[in-house]
């Protein structure tokens, strides 16, 4: 089988993915998770049949245009591929970096002209000098002038450690990507938002968008962390709960706390026992992929239709440190 891409032709080995073939031939296609989640490796098919799995999770409009995930595409015949608009870069600048906790940074970026997104989506942040790229969810709402990211600080994290001193630096953005965003289908539909770690970032954007839209139905936001400090937006969430009677919050940590809303009960248990009619609710899950997969399955078994469960698992880079 042959793969045509940007004027070159490559031989595709038996069972090899399009991304592996292009990487082997140094074609310069970006990638991150290699599991079909981060959408870094989007390409467009100009000729050839697209395996269904290569378009799983993509917007209907993108599928219709022939977009595919190179990491998931193992074609049965020859293909001709091209880059697609979603991988186009937007120039931005880091305008503010501040700690939200010892392990989480708030990074604010200028919003490029014409950069439209929905709260809860994610971007690919690219460092121009060497092409280093990482996906981050947007914690800001679409009405805000600046883009806000919550970045987990990792000891050996190439991007996160660089961002500590990056105020004033030029960066590039790709996207937005993802379907984990607020859907104003009915103001009477309850919303459950549950996330671990910096999985709170997209949920914070979705929550505030719902409140700004006048969502009157019950809202539950649950955040899990390895310590009390890991509930890094607890004060902000508590303030919102005071202002909006329809909002209740809960925290899960391995230990007791003076705040009765924070307990040792697992995030999964709190979500399943949150008191909302799960079969009629719209649900958002973000963070640790094992948590997201497990709770998504449990919620489905509890009666929530899959098309009302929006999931955004956070994945580590494939085969390399952050």
Regions flagged by a language model, labelled:
Residues 190-194, 284:
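Conserved beta-strand elements of the Class I
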Residues 1-3, 9, 68-73, 82-110:
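Short N-terminal strand-loop motif that marks the start
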Residues 89-169, 225-226, 253-255:
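Ferredoxin-reductase
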Residues 3, 81-84, 123-128, 169-175:
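Short conserved beta-strand and strand-loop elements enriched in small hydrophobics
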Residues 176-186:
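A short, basic/flexible loop-to-alpha-helix module at the beginning of a structural domain
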Residues 120, 199, 288:
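Short, conserved phosphate/pyrophosphate- and ester-handling motifs at nucleotide-, phospho-/glycolipid
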Residues 202-212:
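Histidine-anchored nucleotide/phosphate-binding helix
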Residues 1-79, 222-322:
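Reductase modules of NAD(P)H-dependent flavoproteins
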């Amino acid at each position: 089988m042959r793969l045509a891409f940007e004027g070159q032709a490559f031989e595709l080995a038996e069972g090899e993915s399009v991304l592996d073939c292009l990487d082997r031939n140094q074609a310069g296609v970006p990638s991150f998770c290699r599991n079909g989640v981060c959408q870094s490796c989007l390409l467009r098919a100009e000729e050839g049949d697209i395996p269904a799995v290569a378009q799983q999770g993509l917007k209907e409009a993108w599928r219709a245009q022939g977009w595919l995930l190179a990491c998931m595409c193992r074609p049965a015949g020859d293909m001709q591929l091209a880059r697609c608009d979603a991988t186009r870069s937007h120039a931005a600048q880091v305008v503010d970096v501040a700690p939200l906790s010892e392990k989480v940074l708030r990074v604010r970026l200028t919003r490029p002209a014409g950069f439209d997104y929905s709260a809860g989506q994610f971007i690919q942040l690219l460092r121009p000098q060497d092409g280093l790229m990482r996906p981050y969810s947007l914690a800001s709402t679409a009405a805000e002038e600046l883009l806000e990211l919550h970045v987990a600080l990792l000891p050996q994290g190439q991007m996160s450690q660089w961002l500590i001193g990056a105020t004033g630096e030029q960066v590039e953005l790709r996207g937005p990507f993802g379907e984990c965003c607020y859907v104003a289908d009915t103001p009477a539909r309850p919303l459950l938002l549950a996330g671990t770690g910096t999985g709170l970032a997209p949920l914070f954007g979705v929550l505030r968008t719902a409140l700004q839209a006048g969502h009157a139905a019950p809202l539950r936001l649950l955040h899990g962390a390895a310590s009390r400090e890991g509930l890094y937006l607890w004060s902000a969430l508590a303030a919102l709960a005071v202002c909006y009677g329809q909002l209740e919050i809960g925290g899960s940590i391995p230990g007791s706390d003076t705040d009765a809303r924070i307990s040792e009960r697992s995030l999964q248990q709190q979500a399943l026992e949150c008191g909302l009619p799960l079969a009629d609710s719209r649900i958002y899950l973000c963070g640790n992929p094992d948590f997201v997969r497990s709770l998504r399955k449990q919620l489905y078994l509890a009666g929530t239709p899959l098309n009302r469960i929006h999931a955004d698992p956070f994945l580590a880079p494939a085969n390399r440190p952050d």
